[in-house]
Structures are given as C-alpha cells and as structure tokens.
Amino acid sequence: MIKVGILDSTLREGEQTPGVIFTVDQRVEIAKALSDLGVSMIEAGHPAVSPDIYEGIKRIVKLKKEGIITSEIVGHSRAVKRDIEIAAELEVDRIAIFYGVSDLHLKAKHKATREEALRTIAETISYAKNHGVKVRFTAEDGSRTDFDFLVTVSKTARDAGADRVSIADTVGILYPSKTKELFSALTREVPNLEFDIHAHNDLGLAVANALAAIEGGATIIHATVNGLGERVGIVPLQQIAAAIKYHFGIEVVKLDKLQYVSSLVEKYSGIPMPPNYPITGDYAFLHKAGVHVAGVLNDPRTYEFMPPETFGRTRDYTIDKYTGKHALRDKYEKLGVKISDAEMDQILAKIKSNTTIRFYRDVDLLELAEEVTGRVLKPRPPEQIEALISVKCDSNVYTTSVTRRLSVINGVKEVMEISGDYDILVKVQAKDSNELNQIIESIRATKGVRSTLTSLVLKKM
C-alpha cells in the first residue's frame, strides 16, 4: 500500500529562486496557508543564513505550539555544529542536515574523502539528535553518487539517529525508470529508514521522477508552490498533488485550496504564473477548439482529466475563429439572449472572418448579435453577485481581531490579511445588489474598520 506525504519547501528552496525574497510577515502567512492546505511538513528555512529567516521560523514555531499551524516544522542546516545549534534553539520539530555525497561534491566542494564524509555525517546527525529533535539527512547530489556508497551513507545516517534520508537529484538529471529503480533498491538495501525525493526540474522531469520515486517506496515528496527554487526550481506542489490524486487516489493536500496558495505565493514572490501552467494557470480549464468545446459541453471528461471544481476552479471556453455552433449557442444561452439558427450562422461567419480578434468578450458578442438581429439585447443578470472588499483598518487596532469580526458577517465567504495599501481583503457573495450593499454596510460598521473599496468580480477562470 502506498504511503506518501508532501514536504513543502517554498520558504527554503523557493526563496532560493533568483530575485525572490520573503519578508518575515510573508513567511508566516505562507506557512499558515500551507498548514491549512494540509502539507505534512513545512521546510521553514535555514535559520543560520540571516536574521529575518531566523525570526520567521521563530514565529512559525510559535504558531505551531499554539495549534494554529499543524504541519511538522523543519529547519535546514549544513553539517556544521553551529548551524545545528541555531536550528535547535528555535525548537523546530526536525532538523534537516545536508551534505554533498557524490565524488564530485566531495572533491570540488568539501575537499574530503568518503571516510571523512561518513564521519562528518555521523557526528552531526548524532549531535542534532542529542538536542532532542528528529533528524533528516539530505544526500546532496545523491542521484550522481555511486550506489554502493549511497547505501553506506544512508545506513550511516540511520545508525546515527536519522529516521529519514532525502535523495537529492540536485541537477535534475534522473529519469523515471532510473528513479524507480534507485528508490526500490534503497528501500530494499536500507531497512528501518524512510526516503524522501528532492527532485530538481532542469530537464522538466521533476514531477515524473517524483511519481516514480513513490512507486519505488519514497514516502515524502519535496515540492514548492509554483515550482519555485534554484535555477528552474523543483517539483511544483499543485502538479504533484493533482498527479498523486489522479494516479494513486491519494489526496495529499486539500486540492480546492491550491489556487489560493498559488496566488498568494505568486504575489509575494513576484514571479508571475504563466497562463498555461497546469492546475492553477488561467488556461488550465479553458477550452478553445470547436470540437473540444462540443465534447466538453456534452461530457467534460472528454477533454478534462479531473473536474475543475476539484481544484476550486471553473471551466470556460474562448470564442474566436476556432469556435463552433455548440460553444456559441451555449454562450448566448448563458447570457440569456435568444438567437435563431439563421442568426447564429451569420454571427459565426462574422467571427470566423475576423482573424485579428483573439478573444470575443461577452460585450463583443452582444454587439455582434445586435448587429445581426437589429434588436437591442439585454443580457440576463447574474444569478449571484461576487465582490472583493478591500478594508483599511484603524492604526491603533490589531488587524487579526478585525479579521475575526469580519469573518462572521453573513455573506462573507473568505477573509485574508494582506500587504499593501489595504490591510484585509474580504470575499463576499450576495443574491442581488441590495444584499451586497447590506454586507458592505456591515463591514463598514465593524469596529476597527476605517474605509473600504469594493471591486465586483466580473469573470472567474
């Protein structure tokens, strides 16, 4: 039976993305979101690197002690006693000690023999265990390490007190069949030890290698939100979570929360999400070709591996020269506009003859319909109104207390503390404009609220 969980390394590996820096507050917010998502472990950073990382981990550990965060908190460390001491004084749940074990790393980086490396690994793991924490050893460049020596390294780590060993594909050169073979052999040769995979994505094979590692016996997959990390990053959390659900039937995180976490990290990292990114990109459940749209309208399974609602998304399709009658008719029906077959043919002909328009918006379709029919058309009002309310708090109030008050107002669906000109973002839903106004007034009347800004949601992808 397959057993697998996710270690999220957005706060450690993810911050090693060129140009990415998280503030202390952002680190804490991301950690809370990851815990709510349900990841097994959060690699909160390498505290010896800088004071802000140290402070971020300190606050994250405090939230863990208070029960607000439930994931296991991991502190990163070199195989250096001072690093271990710094991580241990923060009272993290686990210290992850890394050391390059390939002959290349031993010679070029550590200037050490294999025997010296084994001694360092054993001594530092034992030292960390003496501080009363769980220990993971990371075999850096493990994928390019002689197998027999990798087995010796793993046994040395286990015997010194590590309960996990992470095999790092540091330069992303593994391929799936080799990965499965490697982990199958390691789990066979080194009993009483669990293995992680830390797969870099240099050849675009990180997700495939992670799945293969699971088949080989790995029980923890290292991932980052949006695939952040050194160079081109590591396993993207949203992709591996979806793949594990599809292929193994295991829900390692709350899939419907992936979109929120992805957007949060996109905002704080400053790395934009490509529209064609799997699962959380704008185009992930957006269909274009007429044949595809017709199939989806008849049975979404024809062109969707899982329903978008699983991931908190909705499906849609574009209208352009590739569009067929099924899509166009469905679009007008959703707009509440009646169009005859003959009129539909004329509208479709106009759309196909104009090759310069990439997307026809709803307003464009209404204008085309009015041009063809000669009628003034009014679209059907939306079944419900969604809005985002930006809230600015008084300077002398605790933002979290205002957040709690807002969360119990009828019609409020989600409340988020944010950075920038406003302090809180509130997602609301109302059946009509009157109800929306009542919700807004309730928000404005909440103690600690200074001002609000309302933005209506026009369309969701």
UniProtKB/Swiss-Prot annotation:
Alphabetical list of Gene3D superfamilies matching this protein: 1.10.238.260, 3.30.70.920, Aldolase class I
Binding-site positions, 2-oxoglutarate: 12, 76, 136, 170
GO terms classed as biological process: L-leucine biosynthetic process; lysine biosynthetic process via aminoadipic acid
Function recorded in the entry: Catalyzes the aldol-type condensation of 2-oxoglutarate with acetyl-CoA to yield homocitrate. Carries out the first step of the alpha-aminoadipate (AAA) lysine biosynthesis pathway.
UniProt keyword annotations, A-Z: Amino-acid biosynthesis, Lysine biosynthesis, Magnesium, Manganese, Metal-binding, Transferase
Pfam families (UniProt xref): AsnC_trans_reg, HCS_D2, HMGL-like
Catalyzed reactions per annotation: acetyl-CoA + 2-oxoglutarate + H2O = (2R)-homocitrate + CoA + H(+)
Binding residue positions for Mg(2+): 13, 198, 200
Entry's transmembrane regions: none
Cofactor(s) listed: Mg(2+); Mn(2+)
Molecular function in Gene Ontology: 2-isopropylmalate synthase activity; homocitrate synthase activity; metal ion binding
Family, similarity comment: Belongs to the alpha-IPM synthase/homocitrate synthase family. Homocitrate synthase LYS20/LYS21 subfamily.
This enzyme's EC code(s): 2.3.3.14
Pathway: Amino-acid biosynthesis; L-lysine biosynthesis via AAA pathway; L-alpha-aminoadipate from 2-oxoglutarate: step 1/5
Domain spans labelled Pyruvate carboxyltransferase: 4-259
Residues forming the catalytic site: 292 (proton acceptor)
Name the record gives this protein: Homocitrate synthase
